[in-house]
C-alpha cells in the first residue's frame, strides 16, 4: 500500500461557537467533505476531498465556515515548486495523465492588463452615451470590398448571410454534457433576450432548445456528435471546430459518467460510453479539405447560414487564418491559451498555445496586408473578462468576442477548476440530477442578462470617452490603444505605441 504524500490543499475552518450542526454543509457537498458525528453531536470534515467551491460557505446559515489555503508547504525551492512536486506524487500514485479544468492559471503575462485606452480631451470632443446615440450593433460575415450603387442610388451588392448582434459579444461553445441542461437553457434564454448568440459546443442540440435557433450557433467537431440535417438547419450559423485554446492539437473527451439520458440521445452515442473526439477531423488534412467541408455545409443549408471556423491560437496562427479566409468560411473564431475547458490534460493546458491578444493582432494585420480582411469577420475568445477587454479586442481588430468563463461565473461558478469530476456543486458542470436542479435557468439567464447589459453600458461609456460612436469606427483602430510594461517586440506585434508616444 502506497504512502499518501499529498497534504490537503485546503483547510476547512469551522467556528464551533457559530455552528448549529444543521448539516446544510453535509447535504450541499457532492464531494462528501462534511459529515455528522452522531456520537459527539458535532460536524466533522475530510479536508482531502475539498476543492474550495465555496458552496458550504455560501449556504451556511450562521456563517460558521470558511475555506483557506493550507499553509503546510514543502521546503522552499525555486525550481521544484510545491505544485510541481504534488503533481509528481499524483502521477506516481495513479500512473495517469493529469487532468484539469478551466483556462491556464499560470502567472504568464495578461496583455489586456498592459494595454491602455485613449480618451478625448480638449482637441476632440467626447460623446455622452446617456444623451447621444451609440451603435453597439455588429454584423458578422463576409463583406464586399466596396459599395456599388445603381443609377437611382440604391445598393447594387448582394451580401452573403450575416449574423446580427445587438452588442459585440457571444456566448462561446460549451457542450451539453460538459455543462448541464439548466446551464444550456440559461445561455439560450439569455442570448434570445439580449439579441446575441450562444454556441452549442460539440455535443449536439437538445430537442427542447430548437426553438431558440435564431440565437444559436451549432458546432461541428471532429467527433461529429449529434450532427444531422435538422441540427445543421436549427441554428443561425455553423461552426467547424478545428481547435480549442485550452487544448490545441488534441480532441475533446467527455467521460462516460456524463453520457447519461438525454446527453446520450442528443450526442447519438451509447449511454455510459466515453465521447472521444479525434485530434484531427479525419476528412480534413489541408486547406483544400477544409474548403470542401465548408461548402458541403453551405450546400446542406442552401447557402443560408454563415460558416465559422474555430481554431486555437498557435505559433503560426496568421498563416492559418490566411488559409481559412480563402477557404470560403465567413467567420474565423480564434481561441487563446487562457480559454476555458471542461477537461484538458494539464500539461497541454499550461504549455501549449499563445495569448489571444498577440494572435488577434497578428491575424488582423496579416489579413489586411494580403487585402482579404473583408473576406471574413474575426471573433476572439480565451479569457475575455470585462467590457474593457472587449473594447481592447475590437480596437486590435476583432469584430466580436466570445465569452464562456465569465458567463459561468455569472451563473454561480466559483472557479474551483474541477469540472472534469462531474461533481459541480453549483449545478453547472454536472449531469447528476440532484445537482443540476440547483441551477434555476430563469435565475441563471437573468444574471447573464444583467452581466451583458452592464457590459453594454460600459462599452458605450468607453467608446464615448474616445469620441467614437460605433463599433465599426472602433474596429482595428489601434491608435486608441497604448502599451505599458511591454518591450519593443510586443508593441510591434500588437501594432500599438508605448504610453506617452
Residue ranges and their predicted role:
Residues 1-6, 33, 57, 61-262, ...:
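Conserved, well-structured core domains of diverse proteins
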Residues 3-9, 75-119, 341-357, 365-377, ...:
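Conserved active-site-proximal phosphate/metal-binding subdomains
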Amino acid at each position: 500500500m502506497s504512502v499518501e504524500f499529498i497534504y490537503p490543499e485546503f483547510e476547512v475552518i469551522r467556528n464551533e461557537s457559530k455552528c448549529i450542526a444543521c448539516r446544510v454543509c453535509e447535504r450541499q457537498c457532492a464531494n462528501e467533505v462534511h459529515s455528522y458525528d452522531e456520537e459527539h453531536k458535532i460536524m466533522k470534515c475530510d479536508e482531502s476531498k475539498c476543492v474550495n467551491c465555496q458552496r458550504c460557505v455560501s449556504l451556511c446559515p450562521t456563517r460558521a465556515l470558511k475555506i483557506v489555503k493550507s499553509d503546510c508547504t514543502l521546503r522552499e525551492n525555486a525550481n521544484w515548486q510545491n505544485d510541481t512536486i504534488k503533481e509528481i506524487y499524483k502521477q506516481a500514485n495513479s500512473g495517469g495523465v493529469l487532468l484539469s479544468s478551466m483556462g491556464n492559471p499560470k502567472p504568464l503575462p495578461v496583455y489586456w492588463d498592459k494595454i491602455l485606452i485613449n480618451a478625448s480631451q480638449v482637441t476632440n470632443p467626447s460623446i455622452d452615451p446617456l444623451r447621444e446615440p451609440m451603435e453597439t450593433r455588429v454584423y458578422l460575415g463576409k463583406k464586399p470590398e466596396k459599395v456599388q450603387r445603381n443609377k437611382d442610388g440604391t445598393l447594387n451588392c448582394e451580401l452573403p448571410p450575416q449574423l446580427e448582434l445587438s452588442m459585440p459579444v457571444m456566448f462561446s461553445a460549451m457542450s451539453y454534457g460538459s455543462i448541464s441542461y439548466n446551464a444550456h437553457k440559461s445561455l439560450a434564454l439569455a442570448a434570445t433576450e439580449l439579441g446575441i448568440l450562444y454556441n452549442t459546443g460539440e455535443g449536439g442540440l437538445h430537442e427542447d432548445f430548437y426553438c431558440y435557433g435564431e440565437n444559436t450557433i451549432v458546432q461541428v467537431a471532429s467527433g461529429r456528435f449529434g450532427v444531422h440535417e435538422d441540427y445543421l438547419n436549427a441554428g443561425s450559423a455553423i461552426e467547424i471546430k478545428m481547435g480549442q485554446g485550452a487544448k490545441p492539437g488534441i480532441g475533446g473527451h467527455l467521460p462516460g459518467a456524463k453520457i447519461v439520458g438525454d446527453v446520450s440521445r442528443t450526442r447519438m452515442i451509447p449511454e455510459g460510453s466515453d465521447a472521444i473526439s479525434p485530434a484531427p477531423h479525419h476528412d480534413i488534412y489541408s486547406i483544400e479539405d477544409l474548403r470542401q467541408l465548408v461548402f458541403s455545409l453551405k450546400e446542406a443549408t442552401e447557402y443560408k447560414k454563415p460558416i465559422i471556423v474555430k481554431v486555437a491560437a498557435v505559433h503560426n496562427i496568421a498563416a492559418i487564418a490566411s488559409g481559412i479566409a480563402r477557404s470560403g468560411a465567413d467567420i474565423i473564431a480564434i481561441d487563446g491559451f487562457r480559454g476555458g475547458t471542461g477537461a484538458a490534460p494539464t500539461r497541454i493546458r499550461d504549455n501549449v498555445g499563445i495569448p489571444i491578444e498577440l494572435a488577434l493582432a497578428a491575424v488582423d494585420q496579416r489579413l489586411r496586408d494580403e487585402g482579404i480582411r473583408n473576406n471574413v469577420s474575426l471573433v476572439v475568445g480565451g479569457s475575455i473578462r470585462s467590457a474593457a477587454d472587449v473594447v481592447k479586442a475590437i480596437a486590435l481588430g476583432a469584430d466580436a468576442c466570445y465569452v464562456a468563463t465569465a458567463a459561468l461565473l455569472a451563473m454561480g461558478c466559483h472557479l474551483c477548476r474541477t469540472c472534469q469530476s462531474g461533481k459541480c456543486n453549483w449545478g453547472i458542470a454536472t449531469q447528476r440530477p440532484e445537482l443540476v436542479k440547483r441551477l434555476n435557468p430563469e435565475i441563471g439567464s437573468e444574471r447573464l442578462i444583467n452581466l451583458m447589459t452592464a457590459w453594454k453600458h460600459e462599452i458605450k461609456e468607453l467608446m464615448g470617452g474616445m469620441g467614437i460612436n460605433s463599433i465599426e469606427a472602433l474596429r482595428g483602430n489601434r491608435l486608441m490603444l497604448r502599451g505599458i510594461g511591454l518591450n519593443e517586440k510586443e508593441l510591434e506585434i500588437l501594432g500599438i505605441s508605448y504610453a506617452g508616444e
